[in-house]
C-alpha cells in the first residue's frame, strides 16, 4: 500500500466514524465573502502567482520549524503571495480545520483547504471553516467522483484546484473543464520530487486553463527550470516554512510568466 492509499483509507474511516459530521456540527461558520478570487489574481498578474502554504509536517518531513502562523500568513500577504494553502489533515500533516478557521480570518487572500477530499461532506466542512478554494486529487477519485465533487464545489462558490500527476490525469482534468490545474511533481508511489516533471506533463497542454506547479520547488533555480513550460503559478510549502527571510525570498519567486 502506498502512502497515498493509506491516507485515503484513513479518510474513509473518518467519514464512517462521523469525524466530518462532528466538525460540521461544532465549527463556527466563517464568512468568506471578502475573500479575493485566485483565478482573478492569476488573470491580472503578469508574474507567477504564488500559493504559499502553511504546513507543520508531511510523511517525508518531520522537522519543519515552528512558526507564529498568524505572522507567517501576514508575511505571505505582505511579500506578494496571491493565495494561502492550509493543510487540514491532522494525522499525516499536523494540520486541522480549527487551524484553517483561525488563520483564514487573518488574511483577505484566497485560502485553499488542502486535504484528501473524497466526499461532499469534506467540502462542506472546508467551506464552513473558511476555505474559498479546495483541492481535488485526480489520482484518488473515479471520473464520476471527480465530476460530482468538482460541480458540487463550484455550486458552493468555491474555486477548485484539480491536481494531476501524469498526462492521463491531465486529460481527466480537462474532461471536467477544470479552470485551475495543479501539476504535482511528487512521485505518489515513492513520495520523491522532480520539479521538471512539470515540463513533461505540460508539453501538450491546452489553452484556456491555468497551471500551477506543486511540490519540490526550493529556490529560484527550480523556478527557472520550469518557467518555460507556461505555468501561471507555484504552490510552495516547505521552502517558505524554512525561510527566515521571506521579504527577500518570496518576491524572487514571482518571475515574469513565459507563455508557451
UniProtKB/Swiss-Prot annotation:
It catalyses: 1-(2-carboxyphenylamino)-1-deoxy-D-ribulose 5-phosphate + H(+) = (1S,2R)-1-C-(indol-3-yl)glycerol 3-phosphate + CO2 + H2O. InterPro entries: Aldolase_TIM, Indole-3-glycerol_P_synth, Indole-3-glycerol_P_synth_dom, Indole-3-GlycerolPSynthase_CS, RibuloseP-bd_barrel. Pfam families: IGPS. Keywords: Amino-acid biosynthesis, Aromatic amino acid biosynthesis, Decarboxylase, Lyase, Tryptophan biosynthesis. GO terms for biological process: L-tryptophan biosynthetic process. Its EC number is 4.1.1.48. PANTHER family: INDOLE-3-GLYCEROL-PHOSPHATE SYNTHASE, TRYPTOPHAN BIOSYNTHESIS PROTEIN. Belongs to the TrpC family. This is Indole-3-glycerol phosphate synthase. The gene is trpC.
Amino acid at each position: 500500500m502506498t502512502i497515498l492509499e493509506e491516507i485515503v483509507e484513513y479518510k474513509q474511516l473518518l467519514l464512517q466514524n462521523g469525524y466530518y459530521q462532528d466538525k460540521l456540527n461544532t465549527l463556527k461558520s466563517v464568512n468568506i465573502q471578502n475573500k479575493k478570487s485566485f483565478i482573478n489574481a492569476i488573470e491580472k498578474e503578469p508574474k507567477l502567482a504564488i500559493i504559499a502554504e502553511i504546513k507543520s509536517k508531511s510523511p517525508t518531513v518531520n522537522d519543519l520549524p515552528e512558526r507564529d502562523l498568524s505572522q507567517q500568513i501576514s508575511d505571505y500577504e505582505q511579500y506578494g503571495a496571491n493565495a494561502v494553502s492550509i493543510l487540514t489533515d491532522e494525522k499525516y500533516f499536523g494540520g486541522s480545520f480549527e487551524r484553517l478557521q483561525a488563520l483564514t480570518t487573518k488574511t483577505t487572500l484566497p485560502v485553499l483547504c488542502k486535504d484528501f477530499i473524497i466526499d461532499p461532506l469534506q467540502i462542506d466542512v472546508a467551506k464552513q471553516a473558511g476555505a474559498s478554494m479546495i483541492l481535488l486529487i485526480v489520482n484518488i477519485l473515479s471520473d464520476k467522483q471527480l465530476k460530482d465533487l468538482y460541480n458540487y464545489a463550484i455550486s458552493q462558490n468555491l474555486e477548485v484546484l484539480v491536481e494531476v500527476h501524469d498526462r492521463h490525469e491531465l486529460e481527466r482534468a480537462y474532461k471536467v473543464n477544470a479552470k485551475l490545474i495543479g501539476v504535482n511533481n511528487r512521485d505518489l508511489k515513492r513520495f520523491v520530487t522532480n520539479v521538471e516533471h512539470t515540463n513533461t506533463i505540460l508539453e501538450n497542454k491546452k489553452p484556456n486553463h491555468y497551471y500551477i506547479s506543486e511540490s519540490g520547488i526550493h529556490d529560484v533555480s527550480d523556478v527557472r527550470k520550469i518557467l518555460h513550460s507556461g505555468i501561471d503559478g507555484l504552490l510552495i510549502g516547505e521552502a517558505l516554512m524554512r525561510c527566515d527571510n521571506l521579504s527577500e525570498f518570496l518576491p524572487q519567486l514571482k518571475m515574469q510568466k513565459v507563455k508557451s
